[in-house]
Amino acid sequence: MRESKANKIERAKGVYQSLFSEYPDAKCSLYYKSPHELLVATILSAQCTDHRVNQVTLGLFEKYTSPKDFAYCDVSELSKDVHSCGYHNQKSKSIQGASLKIVEEYGGQVPNNLDELVSLPGVGRKTANCILGEIYNVPSMVIDTHMVRIMNLLKFTHTKDAKKIEFELMALFEYKNWVKLTHLIIDHGRAVCIARRPKCGACVINQICPSAVT
């Protein structure tokens, strides 16, 4: 029997409340001190762990201290600096390209709306929503691999398409909770609902998860 939207919304409330109680301090785990540093870190985080990114940016942000430094740097040198994050050639080009546009078109300020953010080289909805939520306090959802996997397990979505998932979840979870939800799901995905070996017996939402094996 197909679950009604009203019932999904009720389950979504339960999921949020339970995870919030379990991970009250959940927050962005990327290291940054400015909007532009978060932009760089988020670009580097694609197909890479936040832990690795933080190891790299610790020295990177001492070497490149402003958007201008990234915009006018030697991209081959930048590529070497971010090598351990993977896909270093593409990521370095994206970072330099985005930084150049920020410097030349936005006065060195990272844009504060989705359309302008996704116009930056290498910036998609995931990175843009991260910036909007973390820096500008605009309710938004970052659909990463944890969100895709766990929301499918919860049967709140039946697709792997990040944009479709984003809009489906917007209809289920309260607007004010969108940013926090992402961090809760990421923490839960790392600690309990681990890919290929979820710890359903230790899960605080196993009673309302259709995929739970207890």
Model-derived segments and spans:
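Catalytic cores of DNA base-excision repair glycosylases
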Residues: R2-T214
